[in-house]
Amino acid sequence: MFSIVVVTVFLASCLAMPIQEPYSYSSAVGQGLGTPFVSSGEGRITGVRVWETNNNYYYYYYYYYNSNAYISGFQLRYGYTWSPVFGREGGVKQEMELFNDEAIVEVSGKYNPADYIGHLVLTTNNGRTLSAGLPSQISFNFYPANMGNELRLLSGRFNGVGITSIGAHWGLVYMEGAGNSTGNSTSS
């Protein structure tokens, strides 16, 4: 009789525990015009490339610096395979390879609601960052809703010039031996 009570209490406590969603989404920011994109791939994100374009304008009677910078394109690497380039490969390229057990846990930056994503910062769980563009206009900050999640994919829109909107999708990666190791291991 006592064991029936213990089992019943155990099952009731299991049902009372909140079930944590393994995925979350940070809503897209930006103008949102152009061709939609969704990055995807097998395994963890192991590398990132971001292209930024900086425009400086000169006027007739005086020098005027316009800090009109924007993200022209980006690319994610899943395992050893690079995704297509979303946007275009124009301007200056910034690149970051992730270490083993390193993951992107925050996406932040600035956007101009009239045109492009102007600044993009990707931060890892090791505290490393990749920063592209110039910080001006409206801020955004994306991070996972659940502990232990990491960036799984980016979505949004781009046109022939740059990225017009961006959103982040977070989740768990269930893989044995996931990482960015290129070394060969031998067993004895």
Regions found by a protein language model. Name each.
Residues 2-188:
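Lectin-type carbohydrate-recognition ectodomains
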